């Protein structure tokens, strides 16, 4: 059994359902400390975060490459639907099954073993290796990576490169990396009306009828055209609720929850202003609360993307694709202190599902890609 596979299994065996780390990070610290990493644990509201650093011979003047990831996993769902226990690593048909196998304990194991091999081969490496690991990526993400980034900002520390181990591969291992992510902003809209008997509409004010034209305009609006890296911004309704459940009562208010996934072609302020302008144009009386869960970030082609593309090509023979599709990730926080943030990891087809798994044959190549990037950028 390879060292990467063994460590992956050790991590899967720890039932680290968010935000409980289940001492996964303690296991990582033992391995990293043996390599000479300095480390600190940053705890916040039940969340465990790890920042570990091994300086190269160039000291603080050298380039810093960070590996970022999360030890927490999503809940298992109904246990009876799993073919094998989710926290008992199980091999079947060339696959390793277990919650977190693909998202993202294999990536973390790959980070660690790649660093071990790199340090053994390059004991006098010039640049710095760092690890940023959290147990709050699958949850609210309010006490995890963002807290470490804030602490680093206060100390004036920065990263030059960061690889986030998210499972980005789509159809084949290595076929896709993420060099950016769209921003996410949600709105909770309450349109006010006047409740009344449905037989006497002249004595009431139906908020659903008032809302409908504005809603149609919001749905039809083209928010931007996207750009070279991002598709156009999207606006989607997630929930609509109104009424008491009775068939003879005009409701007093209508509630709508919606979400923007927006590119670097738009801004938070600009999108909010346009929504308010449409609602105001239709003469609505309303309350609107906004929640921005992440700003868009983008890493243009550069040293990190080139090194990762070459590493993937050398390891798999594939020409990888740069993409910004998908949901948000902790890369949105890291981008505040790092100009080059790229996500790369295993196939994502089974993540968050019953019987999550990773192809055993992909585990060593994953580690090798990470090691090849270290060799190119900080040896």
Curated annotation (Swiss-Prot):
Coiled-coil intervals, chain numbering: none
GO terms for biological process, alphabetical: diaminopimelate biosynthetic process; L-arginine biosynthetic process; lysine biosynthetic process via diaminopimelate
Record's subunit section: Homodimer.
Source organism phylogeny: Bacteria, Pseudomonadati, Pseudomonadota, Betaproteobacteria, Burkholderiales
Involved pathway(s): Amino-acid biosynthesis; L-lysine biosynthesis via DAP pathway; LL-2,6-diaminopimelate from (S)-tetrahydrodipicolinate (succinylase route): step 3/3
Listed name of the protein: Succinyl-diaminopimelate desuccinylase
Gene that this sequence comes from: dapE
Family as reported in the entry's similarity comment: Belongs to the peptidase M20A family. DapE subfamily.
Catalytically driven reaction(s): N-succinyl-(2S,6S)-2,6-diaminopimelate + H2O = (2S,6S)-2,6-diaminopimelate + succinate
Species: Paraburkholderia phytofirmans (strain DSM 17436 / LMG 22146 / PsJN)
Cofactor binding note: Binds 2 Zn(2+) or Co(2+) ions per subunit.
Residues the record marks as active site: 72, 137
Binding site for Zn(2+) 1: 70, 103, 166
The protein's Enzyme Commission number: 3.5.1.18
Pfam name, any one: M20_dimer
Keywords: Amino-acid biosynthesis, Cobalt, Diaminopimelate biosynthesis, Hydrolase, Lysine biosynthesis, Metal-binding, Zinc
Residues the record lists as binding Zn(2+) 2: 103, 138, 352
UniProt xrefs under Gene3D superfamilies: 1.10.150.900, 3.30.70.360, Zn peptidases
GO molecular function terms noted in the UniProt entry: acetylornithine deacetylase activity; cobalt ion binding; succinyl-diaminopimelate desuccinylase activity; zinc ion binding
Function as written in the Swiss-Prot or TrEMBL entry: Catalyzes the hydrolysis of N-succinyl-L,L-diaminopimelic acid (SDAP), forming succinate and LL-2,6-diaminopimelate (DAP), an intermediate involved in the bacterial biosynthesis of lysine and meso-diaminopimelic acid, an essential component of bacterial cell walls.
Cofactor(s) in the UniProt record: Zn(2+); Co(2+)
């Amino acid at each position: 059994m390879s060292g990467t596979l063994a460590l992956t299994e050790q991590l899967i065996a720890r039932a680290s359902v968010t935000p409980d780390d289940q001492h996964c990070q303690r296991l990582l610290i033992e391995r990293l400390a043996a390599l000479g990493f300095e480390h600190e644990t940053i705890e916040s509201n039940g969340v465990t975060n790890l920042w570990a650093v091994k300086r190269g011979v160039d000291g603080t003047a050298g380039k810093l490459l960070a590996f970022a990831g999360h030890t927490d996993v999503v809940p298992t769902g109904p246990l009876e639907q799993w073919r094998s226990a989710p926290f008992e690593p199980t091999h079947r048909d060339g696959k390793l099954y277990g919650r977190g196998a693909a998202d993202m304990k294999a990536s973390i194991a790959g980070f660690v073993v790649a660093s071990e091999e790199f340090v053994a081969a390059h004991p006098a490496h010039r640049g710095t290796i760092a690890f940023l690991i959290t147990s709050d990526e699958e949850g609210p993400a309010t006490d995890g990576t963002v807290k470490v980034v804030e602490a680093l900002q206060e100390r004036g520390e920065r990263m030059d490169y960061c690889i986030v181990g998210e499972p980005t591969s789509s159809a084949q291992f290595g076929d896709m990396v993420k060099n950016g992510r769209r921003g996410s902003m949600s709105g909770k809209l309450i349109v006010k009306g006047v409740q009344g008997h449905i037989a006497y509409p002249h004595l009431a004010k139906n908020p659903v009828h008032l809302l409908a034209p504005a809603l149609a305009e919001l749905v039809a609006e083209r928010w931007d055209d996207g750009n070279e890296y991002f598709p156009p911004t999207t606006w989607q309704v997630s929930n609509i609720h109104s009424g008491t459940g009775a068939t003879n009562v005009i409701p007093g208010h209508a509630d709508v929850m919606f979400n923007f996934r927006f590119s670097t072609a738009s801004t938070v302020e600009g999108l909010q202003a346009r929504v308010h302008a449409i609602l105001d144009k239709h003469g609505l009386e309303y309350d609107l609360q906004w929640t921005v869960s992440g700003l868009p970030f983008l890493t243009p082609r550069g040293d990190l993307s080139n090194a990762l593309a070459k590493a993937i090509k050398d390891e798999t023979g594939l020409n990888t694709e740069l993409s910004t599709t998908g949901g948000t990730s902790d890369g949105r926080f890291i981008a505040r202190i790092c100009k080059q943030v790229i996500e790369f990891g295993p196939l994502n087809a089974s993540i968050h599902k019953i019987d999550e798994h990773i192809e055993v044959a992909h585990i060593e190549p994953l580690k090798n890609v990470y090691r090849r990037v270290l060799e190119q950028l900080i040896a």
